[in-house]
Amino acid sequence: MDHAEENEIPVATQKYHVERPIFSHPVLQERLHVKDKVSESIGDKLKQAFTCTPKKIRNIIYMFLPITKWLPAYKFKEYVLGDLVSGISTGVLQLPQGLAFAMLAAVPPVFGLYSSFYPVIMYCFFGTSRHISIGPFAVISLMIGGVAVRLVPDDIVIPGGVNATNGTEARDALRVKVAMSVTLLSGIIQFCLGVCRFGFVAIYLTEPLVRGFTTAAAVHVFTSMLKYLFGVKTKRYSGIFSVVYSTVAVLQNVKNLNVCSLGVGLMVFGLLLGGKEFNERFKEKLPAPIPLEFFAVVMGTGISAGFNLHESYSVDVVGTLPLGLLPPANPDTSLFHLVYVDAIAIAIVGFSVTISMAKTLANKHGYQVDGNQELIALGICNSIGSLFQTFSISCSLSRSLVQEGTGGKTQLAGCLASLMILLVILATGFLFESLPQAVLSAIVIVNLKGMFMQFSDLPFFWRTSKIELTIWLTTFVSSLFLGLDYGLITAVIIALLTVIYRTQSPSYKVLGQLPDTDVYIDIDAYEEVKEIPGIKIFQINAPIYYANSDLYSNALKRKTGVNPALIMGARRKAMRKYAKEVGNANIANAAVVKVDGEVDGENATKPEEEDDEVKYPPIVIKTTFPEELQRFMPQTENVHTIILDFTQVNFIDSVGVKTLAVMVKEYGDVGIYVYLAGCSPQVVNDLTRNRFFENPALKELLFHSIHDAVLGSHVREAMAEQEASAPPPQDDMEPNATPTTPEA
């Protein structure tokens, strides 16, 4: 303890002194009076639920249409300038991203513009976040593209003898139909989950899982964009090992790369990379980030049109952007059975990304978002949007940061951004028909930088949690090679298994006392902490249930070094030695412990089950062992009490209760008391429901705290010593009477 004596500085020590009884469970219950609770009948609850009042109607409207709450309270003078600047900044970024993410979704670019317009307007009415930017997102777009390419591959045969151009248009039309079907189904799933208040499902997508998944998605997006950057013609792959096939296909065709396309792409790539570094370095001085993507689109379009890159150098361009909005159309519901797995994955991932960013920005600005309403809002955006030929949308991380960072206060900024997209759709779309696809590819790749930076999570999780590192790596690897849909399913299963593993393999500690205090700490962690002679204090930091009850029992015996079976075996061995010495073979066959007439054995330690009810055997503590046999016993620590610290146990199931009853019985057979300390009311209720206290004496084993249990053990031992030193009573007493459990 040298470290405790070095550099000691005299300080005023604050102390507290409390005098109270030792609180066993019965003693504490005598001091407490349960409050009377007014229980409502089912009829009263139904009446209250269906009673219509103006306040209830207003709250329902506020809940399902959040705009009715914040729009009347809009502070025009304070908010309008920020929303105006933010809307313009977000809109000029949303234009190139909408065109680029349509390429990921394997649909014509104009559908990216539709997806940047309709959902944003609808989210303004139904969403609860004031700052996130709704619209196409790289990961979701890639998942949509994977389904579209799987059902409508590049080499599909279009009947009717069409030429190459018409064949491409027919293929794209089929892919749009698939994208609409997936979008509708994912929207229905999100809406139903929101109505059923299933917003909590996002908690199963832990941060390591989401970050590993989005990192793998970034690799998928990167490989998908390579062919546009190099200007090569390759087949688009989806499904298992698609990232490998796509990379190999690009490398095999690299000899056919379009130098002009690569040059334009690299020029834009360098401009964006340097410009983003400039924006980051001088963000405090700039009134708004420089809209680099918009400048890249304008520059790329100007160069392409000026030098006629498409005709002269075969550079692939965006192509025709038809003006005007398409009329509503019904998605093909007959495809649902082919895309339901993808729709579920898209619905969950889209919601997870949205609620994560929404909560981050809400915490920063001091308001709350409703996860269930966010599900409903996304469901409406996707399901109704699919009628207008949009594909699945989510929260865009980069646009959300721009919308918030440029002073956006409400979703009116998003509405303004969508109006800029509407202007392009209705009037100016033809200006961007010469935009090289390599420019859009460079824009997408540069925006993946943040996701690729997530590889830095690995050393962090290596230092902090190997389990979270395992989740990150398994999610990344499975999503990378199995595809994003099956990779996500695999990742969720792995994450749930880690939850089971954490509860099945918790940490077990033997506690000791900090001298002259009521503080009990892990004896392996601190030198000052000492074990109390004759008492073992054992702690678990998890619930006790069917998956870990046997492990808990084994850990107790291993960590404390007190195994009742070994003690019983040592006593039998001592009796045999004593019998051999005195020459009385009958002693060797005598039972060591008898419980209510039953010889100690396997049947005496198991609860009986009759008529589906568990019958626990009465617990009798054998506190004595003949002194003449002690010299034949091995020299070990004399443990008379084991205290189970239940302060970190939040529940115990029927299997755990049975295991606990067996433990109390087994240790009682060898003269060791088992006390339970710090049980929560929930654990006490679990024990009561599972009839652990069928023997009322067992309630004396429960104590309010570890210190109460320690003091109770000391009192019991002192009383036992007094009884042992007292003169024997004058009346006759049966010599082999079985002692009963003394009151603690």
Curated annotation (Swiss-Prot):
Q: Which UniProt keywords apply?
A: Cell membrane, Cell shape, Glycoprotein, Hearing, Membrane, Motor protein, Transmembrane, Transmembrane helix
Q: Where is the STAS domain?
A: 525-713
Location in or out of the cell: Lateral cell membrane
For this record, an example GO cellular component is:
basolateral plasma membrane
Pfam families, per this entry? STAS, Sulfate_transp
Q: Which residues lie on this side of the membrane: Extracellular?
A: 106-109, 148-178, 231-243, 253-258, 305-337, 389-396, 430-436, 485
Reaction it catalyzes: 2 hydrogencarbonate(in) + chloride(out) = 2 hydrogencarbonate(out) + chloride(in)
Annotated tissue distribution: Highly expressed in mature outer hair cells, but not in inner hair cells or other cells of the basilar membrane and the organ of Corti.
Sorted alphabetically, which SUPFAM superfamilies does this protein's record hold?
SpoIIaa-like
Residue intervals annotated with topology Cytoplasmic: 1-79, 126-137, 197-208, 283-291, 362-370, 407-410, 456-469, 498-744
Q: What does this protein do?
A: Voltage-sensitive motor protein that drives outer hair cell (OHC) electromotility (eM) and participates in sound amplification in the hearing organ. Converts changes in the transmembrane electric potential into mechanical displacements resulting in the coupling of its expansion to movement of a charged voltage sensor across the lipid membrane. The nature of the voltage sensor is not completely clear, and two models compete.
Share the domain note from the entry.
The STAS domain mediates dimerization, with both STAS domains latched onto each other in a domain-swapped manner. The N-terminus domain is involved in dimerization such that each N-terminus domain embraces both STAS domains. The STAS domain harbors a unique anion-binding site important for the fine regulation of the high-frequency electromotile properties. The transmembrane domain consists of 14 transmembrane segments organized a 7(+)7 inverted repeat architecture that can be divided into two main helix bundles, the ''core'' domain and the ''gate'' domain.
User: What name has this protein been given in UniProt?
Assistant: Prestin
Which species is this record about?
Meriones unguiculatus (Mongolian jird)
Name of the encoding gene: SLC26A5
